[in-house]
């Protein structure tokens, strides 16, 4: 009798299983869109956490600028907790500069860097101009992106990521929107946040790519085109200021930026099923202080929780039960967490082959040896500290024998005007000007 009951239960489960699987396959696909907004985009992290807590599956994610960075990292498996920890431990003043660590600089260069407050690039030829276009090259930020995306340094199809991903940049050659669905992930993220005039653009083929916010700062249409039936959006853009609030040059400039970023905004909001608008009053794209980051994250969580009932109601529209639990997302296990990799060969792009011996000595690295991520980082600072290269980045690609480490170098063509102020008891103050 027991055997008969057991057989009946097994048969029932087998009959029900296909219906359960069919139901899951037939559910509507969910897309998340994350707007641009610089530092204000820190709010995205905690908003994603709340979406997860609501039991909403995320099938696609798209973003612009900081939304592209958070979205790209989330797409490869970073959890909101990992992202929270990562952003809090960064030295944002250093990251948002092209400063080189003192330990990698010669004594002369150390003394020079301490004298001058501002360093402004200028060029003398079209060849020089190709490496310019902004006050900050974003070297330290780009290297952070490379560290964070280890394991994804090849040119890949972003649809093949754990969560399909896309991000938006703008081609200033013709004003067109460029949607990254493939390529090198860290490069796509860097292009999407290249604020015009602040960060140098990313040059790819015949395109000159800058922050996607000027063409589509809230790309709900992009995530819909990817296949999303239901869209959840997190928007960290500032509301336009009234006339009585526009009292200074920074106010006017900020308003112009915000107006530019409004392109297609209302149309994309209309595509959104649950719209999470974060209160970012009092904060700007440059609010990277620890206190600001803490507040922005908290506001992101509060804004998402304010839409809690809407999120739960979405489950019915998606076609899942109230107690549905999506597949666990992450955590991302980066090579940078392992800290040591076996490197079989090292190459240098953008330089003469004959330079390799000198470069290997400068980097203090050896082929066919274990190399830490700290050693790679130090090698980058040594290369930039030599003052021979305007930029230095790297890729680390897995091979059957180990890893291939390639340094991408750009020879230094541009010159810079360095400005500083010197105080002493006799001259009181004097302006320091220097060209390098």
Model-predicted regions and their roles:
Residues 1-27:
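Bacterial Sec-dependent N-terminal signal peptides
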Residues 42, 399-400, 422-430:
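Solvent-exposed loop/turn segments connecting transmembrane beta-strands
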Residues 401-411, 431-436:
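N-terminal periplasmic accessory domains that precede
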């Amino acid at each position: 009798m027991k055997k008969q009951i057991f057989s009946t239960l097994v048969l029932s489960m087998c009959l029900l299983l296909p219906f359960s699987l069919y139901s899951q396959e037939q559910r509507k696909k969910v897309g998340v869109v994350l707007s641009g907004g610089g530092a204000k985009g820190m709010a995205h992290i905690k908003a994603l956490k709340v979406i997860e807590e609501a039991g909403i599956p995320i099938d696609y994610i798209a973003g612009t600028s900081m939304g592209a960075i958070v979205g790209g990292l989330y797409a490869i498996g970073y959890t909101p907790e990992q992202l929270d920890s990562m952003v809090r431990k960064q030295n944002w003043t250093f990251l948002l500069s092209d400063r080189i660590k003192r330990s990698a600089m010669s004594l002369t260069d150390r003394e020079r860097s301490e004298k001058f407050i501002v360093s402004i690039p200028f060029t003398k030829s079209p060849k020089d101009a190709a490496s310019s276009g902004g006050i900050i090259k974003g070297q330290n930020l780009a290297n952070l992106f490379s560290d964070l995306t280890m394991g994804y340094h090849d040119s890949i199809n972003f649809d093949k990521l754990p969560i399909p991903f896309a991000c938006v940049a703008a081609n200033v050659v013709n004003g067109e929107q460029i949607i990254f669905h493939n390529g090198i992930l860290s490069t796509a993220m860097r292009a999407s946040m290249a604020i015009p005039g602040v960060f140098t653009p990313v040059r790819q083929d015949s395109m000159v790519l800058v922050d996607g916010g000027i063409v589509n700062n809230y790309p709900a249409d992009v995530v819909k085109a990817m296949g999303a039936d239901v869209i959840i959006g997190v928007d960290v853009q500032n509301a336009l200021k009234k006339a009585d609030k526009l009292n200074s040059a920074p106010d006017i400039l900020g308003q112009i930026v915000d107006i530019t970023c409004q392109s297609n905004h209302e149309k994309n909001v209309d595509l959104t099923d649950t719209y999470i608008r974060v209160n970012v009053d009092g904060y700007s794209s440059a609010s990277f202080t620890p206190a600001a980051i803490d507040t922005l994250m908290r506001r992101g969580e509060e804004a998402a929780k304010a839409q809690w009932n809407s999120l739960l109601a979405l489950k019915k529209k998606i076609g899942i039960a109230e107690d549905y639990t999506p597949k666990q997302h992450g955590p991302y296990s980066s090579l940078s967490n392992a800290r040591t990799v076996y490197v079989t060969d090292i190459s240098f792009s953008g330089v003469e082959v004959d330079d390799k011996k000198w470069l290997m000595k400068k980097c203090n690295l050896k082929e066919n040896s274990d190399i830490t991520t700290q050693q790679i980082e130090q090698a980058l600072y040594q290369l930039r500290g030599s003052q021979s290269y305007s930029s230095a980045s790297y890729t680390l690609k897995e091979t059957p024998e180990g890893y291939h480490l390639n340094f991408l170098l750009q020879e230094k063509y541009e010159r810079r005007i360095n400005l500083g102020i010197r105080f002493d008891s006799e001259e009181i103050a004097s302006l320091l000007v220097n060209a390098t």
